Amino acid sequence: MKRILSCFVFLWGGLTLAAQEIYEFTVTNADGKSVAMSNYRGKVLLIVNTATRCGFTPQYKELEALYEQYAAQGLEILDFPCNQFGQQAPGTAAEIRQFCSANFDVRFPQFDKIDVNGPTAAPLFTYLKEQKGFAGFDLKEKAGQLLDSMLRKQD
């Protein structure tokens, strides 16, 4: 009984270790290195899943322009290629990064190719999909001020 109880406590403890906020995740960049999401604490994050062989691929140019304009103010665009939608992100992470660099001069962080749906979905994207929708931002915070300035320019 003591052994079973110990096992239960261990498993229960493991459940409490599940990420409760985005900064508890670790992801893999396009170079295959682990990156702690806590590195981005205090930044405004735009996390995108992308494909390099679809009708929306030219949006990389717009994402890069957004990054260039607001990176100094704390914007980080985190690009996670995904091949789950019509096999439109072929190649390795390194090949995808090379394509984006050569065609769109992308300089924002790019990460390993992942799945965003199903049983093989990356834990970060599973977490993101479980979150509530946008509820506004606090203009007293740097992130809120940046978002406010970006959205006002687009109105």
Where are these regions (language model features)?
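N-terminal "domain-start" segment that seeds a small globular fold
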Residues: 17-38
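Sec-dependent N-terminal signal peptides
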Residues: 4-13
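Thiol-based oxidoreductase modules, predominantly thioredoxin-like and allied folds used
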Residues: 74-91, 107-118
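Amphipathic alpha-helical repeat scaffolds
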Residues: 29, 49-53
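Conserved helix-turn-beta segment immediately C-terminal to the redox Cys motif
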Residues: 38-44, 52-53, 57-81, 100-104
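Extracytoplasmic/secreted proteins, especially bacterial periplasmic and envelope-associated proteins
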Residues: 58, 62-65, 91, 95, ...
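Thiol/selenol-based redox catalytic cores and closely related redox-interacting motifs
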Residues: 101, 105-155
